[in-house]
Each structure stands twice: as structure tokens, then as C-alpha cells.
Amino acid sequence: MNYFPWLTIIVVFPIFAGSLIFFLPHKGNRVIRWYTICICILELLLTTYAFCYHFQSDDPLIQLVEDYKWIDFFDFHWRLGIDGLSIGPILLTGFITTLATLAAWPVTRDSRLFHFLMLAMYSGQIGSFSSRDLLLFFIMWELELIPVYLLLAMWGGKKRLYSATKFILYTAGGSVFLLMGVLGVALYGSNEPTLNFETSVNQSYPVVLEIIFYIGFFIAFAVKSPIIPLHTWLPDTHGEAHYSTCMLLAGILLKMGAYGLIRINMELLPHAHSIFSPWLMIIGTIQIIYAASTSLGQRNLKKRIAYPSVSHMGFIIIGISSLTDTGLNGALLQIISHGFIGAALFFLAGTTYDRIRLVYLDEMGGIAIPMPKMFTMFSSFSMASLALPGMSGFVAELIVFFGIITGQKYLLIPKLLITFVMAIGIILTPIYSLSMPRQMFYGYKLFNAPKDSFFDSGPRELFLSISIFLPVIGIGIYPDFVLSLAVDKVEVILSNFFYR
């Protein structure tokens, strides 16, 4: 038991500090911006300090454990704890949220509410990644949805209300299945109902009941990830949201679905996961091809960027369903890798729109000359998205490939077939990834426009882009920095499939 409440402070601090925004003096938006950025930086430093000095990466057990009785009536506890699975997403959340607040600098309408919602979303996401109580996990999951809905509905494009409504209908529908799964697992406790995740992990369930629980949790996480055919909210949401909100969606929110698949479907329900893993492998393979094929038909730049998120999720699903430590480590690395790359591409798409006021690719062209810095950064992250060697995406996809090939669960012919189809998807990926910068920056359409109407990236955009690009290169060169966090926990999870 940890005696200093590090995780409670880390979870509560952003939303508590965010609520003070409404009491700041009315002296313009600058005070609110700087206050929010300082809160995010302080939170990131606090998280980094706590993990550096109080977390042992070679220990697969839950660390920084906190357990406080909250509601006596039905034995509801405030249980927090982290392990190798959650530390990476928590640090990613802190990093991307800090940069997203910097990206939101141009937002001036209702800036107090906007920045409060970003900080509230921050708390909900960290709470989801660190919860060790099933009901607390559900509460944090829902807490994070409310700010996202308001950010979508109040700041964005002309169809923002439609996209926000579609988002909340999909996610609320998924949350119903999540709540049913949580209550089902809780009520089927060994002797008495329990919401404790550790107790539930050690509990054995009848196969039929475990399959029912698995399907319920899977639907909830498939909506958030997203997994086809429950992905249709994603392009509309990304197409209408402000680009700082898109950074949070692509960088963190989608990763919560993948985290839930590993944390609950895989760790809590291993027998059902073993049964469903061949089907997940097929879904992941179809998803890679589907996203690569559909992306080419998107005229909207932000929708074109949204579909690679679906494709990358396909690799994560395949890694999770490979039932090998190599494949699962590759999936975890892909979660972190795409968090950086997706956030960067949406930021660059948004800043480009701020300058040229065009969002359809067939209306763009020839802006490489007046905006060379933007061209360089966008091209670099497009290369990272297509998994160029030396960048994080390449290592993640390569490890997932090795996970399939070395897996013992599947026969040789199915493994070769899945690998072949994945290879086709990888061949299609450069087509849609490189067609974006070609349509935007090459050609002639905007070449003769007045050069003073365009201005290139400023210090804020350069700082933000470089801040994301450095981890992408760093992980690509030395992936063990991320892999070492979860390697022991991955072995423990996979041991359930062979020794339980």
C-alpha cells in the first residue's frame, strides 16, 4: 500500500485546477491560456516525477496502490494503481494534452469553458487508465465523454452539432454494454458482489457467461477504438472538430478503447479472448484493407487523416489477438506510436486550414513554395504514418508481424494468408498517405495566389511539431524505451492463456 496519494493527486488535480478558471480575473484570454498550459505542464512534471521515483518497471504487479472506501452501501472503493500497461498511456495523455492546450491558443470564444473542458477530459482519461475498480473505471470512462461532446458541439465546423450528436449516440450506446458488463462481473463475485479488479481477475467464470461478458465489453471498446463497423462516427467527428480537440481524440481517446480490450477483455476474460481471437485477427486484417481503400475516396483533408486511425487500429487488434508476447508488445507500441503521429497530423491539418481556409483536397495545390516549413513537417509525419523505417510506426508494425509469424495458436496457412493480406494493406498505405501532401503542396492551384496571404509556420507551430517528432524518431531508433515498461506485465497476462 502506498501511503502518499500520488495517483489521487494526479487524477484530481487537473479538474480541480480547471474549475478555478471561472474565478480568474477578466483580463482577456491570455491569462486563461497561460494558466491552463501551466496546469498541464505541472501535472506532466508531477506524473513524471511520481513514475520515475516510485514505479519499478521490472515489477509486473500493481504499484502506487490506493484503496479508500467511498460508499459503504454497496462497498464502492476509490481504487487506483498502475502497472506496465497503464504507465505508457498515462504519460502519452499528459504529453498530448499539454501540446493540445498550446495548439488551442487561437481559440477565443468562451475560452474559459473550452480550457476547463480540456482539463476535465484530462482527469477522466488518467482516471480511466489508473482505475482498479470496475465501477470507478466506468465512471471515469463516462466523465471523459461529457467534455468531448461539449468540445465537439460548441467549437468546430458547420456540421458540428450533427457530428457531436452522432458521437454521443455511438459512445452512449457502447457505455450501456460497458455498464452491463461491469455489473455482470461484479454480481458474479466469488462469495459476494465485488467491484475489485484484482478479485475479478482471479475469478473463474462459466464459459458461456464469460463469452456474454466478453461480447458486452467488446462492443463498448469497439465503438471507442474504433473497430468496423462501429467506426462511422470517427470521420464525421474529426472532420468537424477543432484541431486541438482532434489531437485529443486521435492521440488519447481512441487509445482508451484499445487499452480496455487489453485490460478487461484480455486480462479479465482470457478464455473468451482465446475463443474470439481468430475472429479478431480477421476483423483486424479486413480493417487495414478497408481503411486504406476508403481513405482514398475522402475529399476532406481531416477525414482523409481519420481513416489511418482505423487502419492502425487494425494492427493493434491483430497484435492483441496473436496471443504472443511479441504481438502484444507490438500492439502496445502501436498505441503509443499512433498517439503521437495522429495528433501531429491533425494539428498540421488544422494550422494549414487556419492559413488557406480550404479543407477539400481537390481545391488545394501549390502551397509548398509559400509554406516550406509546413510542407516539411506534414511530409515528415505522413512518412511516419506509412511506417517509414527509422520511425516509431515501422517498429510497431514489424513487431506485430513477428508476433503473428511466431505465434503457436494458428496454423501455418492461416498465418501466411493473414500476413499476405496485411502486406497488401501496407502497400496501399503509402498511396493515401503520400497523396495528401501531393494534392496539398504540389500542383499549381494556389501557386499564383498573393504570397502575403499565406504565412508559414510560426514558433508555436514549429515547437509543437518538433516536440512530437522527437519521440517518433526516438521510439523508432530505440523502441526498448517503451517496450521495457510493459514487457513483464505482458508475460503475466499471456501466462493466463497457458497456465490458467
Curated annotation (Swiss-Prot):
GO terms for molecular function: NADH dehydrogenase (ubiquinone) activity; ubiquinone binding. Signal peptide: none annotated. The chain crosses the membrane at residues 4-24, 35-55, 87-107, 134-154, 167-187, 208-228, 242-262, 272-292, 305-325, 330-350, 386-406, 411-431, 462-482. It is a multi-pass membrane protein. The keyword Lipoprotein does not apply. It catalyses: a plastoquinone + NADH + (n+1) H(+)(in) = a plastoquinol + NAD(+) + n H(+)(out); a plastoquinone + NADPH + (n+1) H(+)(in) = a plastoquinol + NADP(+) + n H(+)(out). Its main location: plastid. Its EC number is 7.1.1.-. The keyword Thylakoid applies. One of its GO terms (biological process) is aerobic respiration. GO terms for cellular component: chloroplast thylakoid membrane. It is an enzyme of class 7 (translocase). Keywords: Chloroplast, Membrane, NAD, NADP, Plastid, Plastoquinone, Quinone, Thylakoid, Translocase, Transmembrane, Transmembrane helix. It is found in: Plastid, Chloroplast thylakoid membrane. InterPro entries: NADH_Q_OxRdtase_chain4 (IPR022997), NADH_Q_OxRdtase_chainM/4 (IPR010227), NADH_UbQ_OxRdtase (IPR003918), ND/Mrp_TM (IPR001750). Belongs to the complex I subunit 4 family. PANTHER family: NAD(P)H-QUINONE OXIDOREDUCTASE CHAIN 4, CHLOROPLASTIC, NADH-UBIQUINONE OXIDOREDUCTASE CHAIN 4. This is NAD(P)H-quinone oxidoreductase chain 4, chloroplastic. It comes from Solanum tuberosum (Potato).
